[in-house]
Amino acid sequence: MTLILNPESARVLGCLIEKEITTPEYYPLSLNALINACNQKSNRDPAMSLDEDSVRVALRNLTDKGLARHAPSEGRVPKYEHDVNNAMQLSRREVAILCELLLRGPQTPGELRGRAERMYKFEGIEDVHSTLQRLMERDPALVVVLPRQPGTKEARYTHTLMPVDMQPQPAVEVSHSVSGGNDGRIAQLEAEVRELRAEIETLKEQVKSLTPVN
């Protein structure tokens, strides 16, 4: 059975995994809650605007592949949950990494460590590297390392559930005629800005999860 997903199915799967971990009191998700999760602005790249039909189709796709299902519910409103644990037999740290890759696309180990912290507290960057390595060593692999882009120090990793050319790509940086020292300083500042943005998005999501729903 192929597990290749389209962008909509990848987003739905990532949201189901994320909400189970970060807001378990509201999980499994109703269709409306899942649509809102798919379209939220924080912790998503790219931003999407999925409608009800798109999410229903994505759920059917995931259900056919054994990755999602209707959740048992005593209420009238149907709810949905992922089935990644049974389908893939992943550890908690592996689930956190896969979820972030589904929600944001290719990322560096440093970005993954900061962004996945709301789902799993990694002991350090080495812990992230070892988790990525385990995901790459699976058969078939769930993660691959991408060729390093010009001007970047860290390699990026991505999941294999969706073709790489369908995943979000970082903007290409234009090289200017500046000294080598300035180049290094600019790259350092840009990396710091990226990390700060990731921390801000994480804090936003944590505050949002603490806000009671009326």
UniProtKB/Swiss-Prot annotation:
SUPFAM superfamilies: Winged helix' DNA-binding domain. This is UPF0502 protein Acid345_3645. Gene3D superfamilies: Winged helix-like DNA-binding domain superfamily/Winged helix DNA-binding domain (1.10.10.10). Disulfide bonds: none annotated. Belongs to the UPF0502 family. Pfam families: DUF480. InterPro entries: DUF480, WH-like_DNA-bd_sf, WH_DNA-bd_sf.
